[in-house]
């Protein structure tokens, strides 16, 4: 009888331990620039906190870590990748390239940096990734635009990453650029306002939920 009670106690303890392990949220690091960091917005209104609220409201057990740094290029993201991965990380959102565009950096340079990031995150560490791109403006010329826009598709395919082709794409869905800029952008015309971030999160939220599901044990 004593052995039976001990066995029951061990089984209960094991069950509690397993339940505790399952209760740990999936940690998703959002590696990006000012669009990720929430530039120009009060606390709680940027991309990461609004995304966290979206997931919480739908019962998605995840913690989104804001690893966005304003002004960061793909090279900057690569340089601090080890820091971003230093904790217990289960998945990553990679949203870099906007500042490469603003500086007119060669797409081949941006591509090499993103390739190195994804090689470490998805390749070496085997973590699921959501890659969020941007689209180059037409005034950079067709060759530049084709190379820049295409690198996100190519890299997502290479590393089996989920892909959203443009961080700002949801803002112009169903409307024109002038209307979207007036309604959803801050005065600088580069960064989304609170309402713009909300639109972006509504569009990307389901993809992040899928990412969490892929990362869950």
How should each PLM-predicted stretch be described?
Residues 1-10:
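Bacterial N-terminal signal peptides that target proteins for export
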Residues 6, 41-44, 70, 107, ...:
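Flexible, glycine- and charge-enriched loops at secondary-structure boundaries
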Residues 35-38, 42, 68-72, 99-102, ...:
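Short histidine/acidic/glycine/proline-rich micro-motifs that form metal-
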Residues 60, 76-217:
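Alpha-helical cap/lid subdomain in secreted, periplasmic
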């Amino acid at each position: 009888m004593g052995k039976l009670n001990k066995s029951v106690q061990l089984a209960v303890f094991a069950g509690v331990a397993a339940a505790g392990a399952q209760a740990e949220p999936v940690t998703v690091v959002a590696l990006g620039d000012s669009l990720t960091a929430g530039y120009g917005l009060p606390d709680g209104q940027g991309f990461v906190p609004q995304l966290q609220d979206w997931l919480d409201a739908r019962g998605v057990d995840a913690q989104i870590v804001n690893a966005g740094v304003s002004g960061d290029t793909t090279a900057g993201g690569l340089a601090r990748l080890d820091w971003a991965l230093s904790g217990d990380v289960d998945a990553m959102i990679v949203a870099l390239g906007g500042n490469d565009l603003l500086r007119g950096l060669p797409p081949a340079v941006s591509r090499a940096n993103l390739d190195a990031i994804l090689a470490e995150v998805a390749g070496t560490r085997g973590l699921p990734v959501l890659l969020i791109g941007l689209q180059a403006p037409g005034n950079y010329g067709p060759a530049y635009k084709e190379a820049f826009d295409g690198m996100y598709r190519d890299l997502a395919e290479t590393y089996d990453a989920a892909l959203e082709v443009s961080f700002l794409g949801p803002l112009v869905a169903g409307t024109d650029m002038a209307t979207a800029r007036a309604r959803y952008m801050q005065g600088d015309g580069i960064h989304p306002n609170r309402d713009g971030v909300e639109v972006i999160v509504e569009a990307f939220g389901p993809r992040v939920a899928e990412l969490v599901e892929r990362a869950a044990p």
